[in-house]
């Protein structure tokens, strides 16, 4: 799909520009692409697209051209067309991903064996190589036995939007999405690990068609990240709230940054939900909402509330965490840094690597964490950073919040 984005860049972007605006684009790209004055004069559209593809991999090359061209009024139609073409490719990639996942599920689970749920866990476990006649008998027996299995309430409830994604800590309504029951009998967990993983993969990103109107509470500065599907790209985090609940948001379309201004009311559609967090991508739509819209103070207070560390220890591994925590200790290692955070209920380690390795902070400072994940490391629950994680540091002495410059 990377080639699809390059086709958009070259055929729908650079090739449709007049010479004057192409010269401007080359000048603006000179620093990023390392262009000398001579190169700017000699390089044509094909050469520039080759360099942009290497520097800004995947969709990032189209994003970069949009970013540069959107401030040029004569290129307004070209920019709109680039966004449409980018969305088409994004939808195509999403559709191919669904087809591929279905194929994987069929290969792993088998076309005959049903997906493991609370009702058919027993049959899917033993039905892999049983003759048809015997399988029917086993299925009947399995259904009878499965009725005795009770699904715990916490497993049947949909995940909450993460405030640290913890209902106990924040007491908020869930992010609307489709959920399915999970097997409750732990004795079958090991045997069905492959099937369960397939189910998790297909559920990890759930499209949401219904639009939602929200007020922007806060947003981070854009930052660079790297992922297998997009390579190096840019995103930012935001927190928004409707009249009944709040959402942590990952925004992967940087052109939407101007929409995420504090107290601005917007309508979001065609977004998706992953692990309780709203995701806005190229195919999503964000528009202004001009009517009167008020968010109850209680919702805003809950959205801004940091979960207690004692509550984090009660959450499952994999829970997404957001919040403001005080640094108690900083331990620098060769490959990562351990930031010990503390409140009046306990302490926990935050593992920072990559861009979050050895950031400038000390005891007494506060770390505002975005999109950190609870993980069990050496039999101890810790907060671990991922590719989408972000940290803001609030210095204790100056009491002034600022994001780390890590690029």
UniProtKB/Swiss-Prot annotation:
Q: Where does this chain carry the motif Nuclear localization signal? A: 131-137
Keywords per UniProt: Activator, Cytoplasm, DNA-binding, Nucleus, Repressor, Transcription, Transcription regulation
Which GO terms fall under biological process for this protein? activation of innate immune response; cellular response to interferon-beta
The record's listing under InterPro entries reads:
DAPIN, DEATH-like_dom_sf, HIN-200, HIN200/IF120x, NA-bd_OB-fold
Instruction: Spell out the SUPFAM superfamilies in the cross-references.
Output: HIN-2000 domain-like
| A cellular-component GO term for this protein | cytosol
Q: How does it assemble?
A: Participates in a ternary complex with YY1 and the YY1 target DNA element. Binds nucleolin and nucleophosmin/NPM/B23.
Described by its record, this protein's role is as follows: May act as a transcriptional activator/repressor in the myeloid lineage. Plays a role in the granulocyte/monocyte cell-specific response to interferon. Stimulates the DNA binding of the transcriptional repressor protein YY1.
Q: Which PANTHER family match?
A: INTERFERON-INDUCIBLE PROTEIN AIM2 FAMILY MEMBER, MYELOID CELL NUCLEAR DIFFERENTIATION ANTIGEN
What protein name applies here?
Answer: Myeloid cell nuclear differentiation antigen
Q: Whose protein is this, by species?
A: Macaca fascicularis
